[in-house]
């Protein structure tokens, strides 16, 4: 049992109220002006925000098969440090969770080592990127969160349509990394100013938006919940907006780096600035911000993608795609958008908690009496510089190194257990 004393909580109007919070038996037992108990542990939250634990539906934990990049343990420790209490693990592992046996093995490993809640995706196709569909029913029984071939767009419309029909029959979501391979052209960055300046092959916007346009029509025909991963282009935002207006069951996420950065921020041919989708144009970034504010884009997800140093500290042509994000998402977004009065604090918290929960019907994301005690304590005055040497993640690959941010998680509770406390050893 914990009592969080003298903290602040956000009410429905977005105003801060001084409250104590009692955690008992893994639940939020009481939220009141003052709580006095004779047993349990007191946590001093004076002047700090007590918020629901963050939810990230797009995380690469790399285990099994990529433990040199990340493990379930290190990835969930990083999540806890970043304030995340629920993360959804992508299936680009070795082996791929494309069968009940592999999924059962993964679930056992999660139960054994995870510091926070991990909801694993199953793949759509066997081995990722094939045309053979997995056994959807068996994988749902084994606890799959949803189905995705993340990292690889499903290339054939017929394959995707059949997958959507099977997912719809089970009331499960299809989650899509949208990329038409015939339009990538071997690109490593956005097909724009930076690519031209550096003489690099570019990935055009249409590689993403064309597949989203195809898929929303398939989702309409199949009656499926279709979710777009890491949306990055103005055309994609337009397609999703039109689909929502047409009543199609489509949701979309955006990553912090696509909201904060664009291609003109890239300092040079540095593998730590290589991600997929790539940093796009200023016009694309503006469209993403507009889409998030008007509800076209539903929430924020990090696409945390750790790699070993030797896979990133090389030119872009040789580097792996992806950057880490779990430990820096909140401070970066708070600094860039809340402190600048572009967003309210409540908007940011909602996009990291209740919005993803609502999209995927998860019973998390709210701080209220009776709720699961997934909680992050945030020091909105704490200022610190992003230093990969301090990361709990094995991945140190971030373009934000050296940036000073304000507003950091200082404690995280997952199902009532203190899983991160600032200042304690890793």
Curated annotation (Swiss-Prot):
UniProt keyword terms in alphabetical order: Hydrolase, Metal-binding, Pyrimidine biosynthesis, Zinc
Active site: 303
Protein residues bound to Zn(2+) 2: 150, 177, 230
Protein origin, superkingdom: Bacteria
InterPro entries per record: Amidohydro-rel, DHOase, DHOase/Allantoinase_Hydrolase, Dihydroorotase_CS, Metal-dep_hydrolase_composite, Metal_Hydrolase
Metabolic or biological pathway, per its Swiss-Prot or TrEMBL entry: Pyrimidine metabolism; UMP biosynthesis via de novo pathway; (S)-dihydroorotate from bicarbonate: step 3/3
Binding site for substrate: 60-62, 92, 276, 307, 321-322
Cofactor(s) recorded in Swiss-Prot or TrEMBL: Zn(2+)
Record-listed E.C. numbers: 3.5.2.3
GO MF term set: allantoinase activity; dihydroorotase activity; zinc ion binding
CDD domains in the record: DHOase_IIa
Function, as annotated: Catalyzes the reversible cyclization of carbamoyl aspartate to dihydroorotate.
Protein family (similarity comment): Belongs to the metallo-dependent hydrolases superfamily. DHOase family. Class I DHOase subfamily.
HAMAP family: PyrC_classI_B
Protein name: Dihydroorotase
């Amino acid at each position: 049992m914990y009592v969080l004393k003298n903290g602040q909580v956000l009410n429905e109007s977005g105003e801060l109220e001084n409250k104590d919070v009692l955690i008992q038996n893994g639940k939020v037992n009481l939220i009141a002006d003052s709580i006095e108990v004779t047993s349990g542990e007191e946590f001093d939250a004076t002047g700090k925000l007590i918020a629901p634990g963050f939810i990230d539906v797009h995380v690469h934990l790399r285990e099994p098969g990529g433990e040199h990049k990340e493990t379930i343990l290190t990835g969930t420790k990083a999540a806890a440090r970043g304030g995340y209490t629920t993360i959804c693990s992508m299936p680009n592992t070795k082996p791929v969770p494309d069968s009940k046996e592999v999924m059962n093995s993964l679930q056992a490993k999660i139960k054994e080592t995870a510091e926070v809640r991990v909801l694993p995706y199953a793949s759509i196709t066997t081995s990722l990127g094939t045309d053979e569909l997995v056994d959807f029913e068996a994988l749902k029984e084994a606890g799959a969160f949803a189905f995705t071939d993340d990292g690889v767009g499903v290339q054939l419309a017929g394959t995707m349509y059949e997958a959507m029909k099977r997912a719809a029959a089970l009331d499960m979501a299809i989650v899509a990394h949208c990329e038409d391979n015939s339009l990538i052209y071997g690109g490593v960055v956005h097909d724009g100013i930076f690519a031209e300046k550096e003489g690099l092959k570019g990935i055009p916007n249409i590689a993403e938006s064309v597949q989203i346009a195809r898929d929303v029509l398939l989702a309409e025909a199949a009656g499926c919940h279709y979710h777009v991963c890491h949306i990055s282009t103005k055309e994609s935002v337009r397609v999703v907006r039109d689909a929502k207006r047409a009543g199609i069951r489509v949701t979309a996420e955006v990553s912090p780096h696509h909201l904060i950065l664009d291609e003109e921020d890239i300092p040079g041919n540095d593998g730590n600035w290589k991600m997929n989708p790539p940093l796009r144009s200023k016009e694309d970034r503006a469209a993403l911000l507009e889409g998030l504010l008007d509800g076209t884009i539903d929430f924020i997800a990090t696409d945390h993608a750790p790699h070993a140093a030797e896979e990133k500290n090389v030119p872009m042509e040789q580097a792996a795609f992806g950057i880490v994000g779990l430990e820096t998402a909140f401070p970066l977004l708070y600094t860039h958008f809340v402190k600048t009065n572009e967003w309210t604090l409540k908007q940011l918290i909602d996009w990291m908690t209740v919005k993803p929960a609502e999209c995927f019907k998860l019973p998390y994301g709210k701080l209220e009496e009776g709720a699961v005690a997934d909680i992050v304590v945030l020091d909105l005055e704490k200022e610190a510089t992003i230093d990969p040497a301090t990361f709990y993640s094995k991945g140190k690959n971030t373009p934000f190194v050296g940036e000073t941010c304000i507003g950091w998680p200082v404690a995280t509770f997952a199902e009532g257990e203190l899983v991160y406390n600032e200042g304690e050893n890793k």
